Amino acid sequence: PRKVYPVKGVTVKNNQISGYGNGIIMKLTNTAMVFDNQMKMKKPSVYSNIGIYAEDSRGTSIKKNTVSGTANTGIYFYDAAYSKNSQQKNYIQTNVVSLTGGDGIYLQRMSAASRIEKNTVKSVGGSGIHVKDGKMAGIYSNTVSSNKNHGIRIEYTTGGIWIRGNQVVSNKNCGIMLGKGKVSQVAGNTIYKNSKKGMYINGTDIWEVRDNTVTENGDAQEVYANNCKKLCSIRRPVCKKITTKSTDVAGTADGGYTVTVYAWISGKSQKLGTARVNTKKQFTVKIKKQKKNTVLKIVSKDRYGNAVSVNYTVK
């Protein structure tokens, strides 16, 4: 009879793949496994190749692969009719993707649930992890660094997006960029030394953003939130001059709820004090006098535990 007949139970394992074409292509697969393959591709002059391409596939596991050198995306998933509303989850885990011309890991129009976990994505030409126009993706415990666009980019999603426990470091644009769409949670991520903002959230229908550490990014407005319920932008604290005679640290913390001061002494961080931020965005934290050249870390947290910080040296 006329219907979709998927290819079931395919395993692609322990292959060395190189050259100018695509690495591995799967279409209409069911429970395929792609494990321990090494793909060192070359960029063709007229063709945009991909490392691993899974189109309209259910229950696919892509684990422990190394992908580098493609002109386009490293690992690409795209859903159509067969995967729609599938109960079989896709797994993209413990892969290393680097030096691709496009995004490192890109999921587009996803309707089947996917788990993107413990991958390393570095030095790619696009964003490290990109989810566009889909739903049901968990992005957990990945290391995303030194990519030419955003670290993690989410846009036009319809819900069920969870971003937890990722290290997002030294990307050329923002650390995490959330565009228009629905996102469930962004929690427990460490986002630092990205060239622009740590988190950029614009018009996102988001349930929870909490306990993220956002520091040393290029923009003093570490977290930008526009047209988002519950969430406001957060800037680094700005303090008055701190000297050896100072008995408090005073300044402003736009978007902060509390400010805590730590001192780096004998190789250890010591908490000196905490204060609430008032309605004028001002704070005063009482401290003991500190020695000259002591480095103080000023940490501002919002109501949901999202923390931004700045260092000051005692004069």
Predicted regions and their residues:
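Extracellular beta-strand/beta-solenoid scaffold signature
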Residues: 1-7, 18-27, 44-57, 69-88, ...
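Solenoid scaffold repeats with emphasis on beta-solenoid/beta-helix
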Residues: 5, 9-10, 31-33, 59-60, ...
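Low-complexity, intrinsically disordered tandem-repeat tracts enriched in small residues
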Residues: 26, 32, 59-60, 67, ...
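Residue-level signal for short segments within beta-strands and strand-turn junctions
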Residues: 41, 79, 90, 263-265, ...
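Ser/Thr-rich low-complexity repeats and stalk/linker segments
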Residues: 231-315
